[in-house]
Swiss-Prot record:
Protein name, UniProt field: Pre-mRNA-splicing factor CWC21
Tagged with keyword Ubl conjugation: no
Lineage, broadest ranks: Eukaryota, Fungi, Dikarya, Ascomycota, Saccharomycotina
SMART domains, alphabetized: cwf21
Coiled coil residues, start to end: 65-102
Occurrences of domain CWF21 (ranges): 65-109
GO cellular component: cytoplasm; Prp19 complex; U2-type spliceosomal complex
Purpose of the protein: Involved in pre-mRNA splicing. May function at or prior to the first catalytic step of splicing at the catalytic center of the spliceosome, together with ISY1. May do so by stabilizing the catalytic center or the position of the RNA substrate.
Top-level taxon of the source organism: Eukaryota
UniProt biased composition (Polar residues): 12-27, 110-120
Residue ranges with Low complexity bias: 33-43
InterPro entries named among the record's database cross-references: CWC21, mRNA_splic_Cwf21_dom
Amino acid sequence: MSYNGIGLKSAKGSSTSGHVQRSLASNNRRRPQGSQQQRQQRQNAIKKASHDKASRPLAVQKQIETHMEKREIEVQVSELRDRLEEEETLSEEQIDKKCEALRAKLTNEWQEQQRMSSLYTPRKARLTEEQHRHE
């Protein structure tokens, strides 16, 4: 029932016939590499693709950070709305006005913080950020 040490020692109790087949997954042949020029072009394309991916995380990280900060503002507004609705002392319009006022206040504070942090960005960081924006 086994062939070259592969397979069952005995098919008894295995609910199979014990037949051993060749594995179609094993492929030891190498792909043809092509000419030197084709190999060089492939390597250059791989390097370029990996370089592009390596430069993205800065911009993506900045977008994620901005999104999370805006989300935090909305969470605070939502918590205020829930608290005011539970009290049931204000009308829906008054609750909306208070929520909009809080959202505007928090957004202005966040924008001011963004402006201040951009003023004190090191020159090298500003240059790399500008390069990523123009690409």
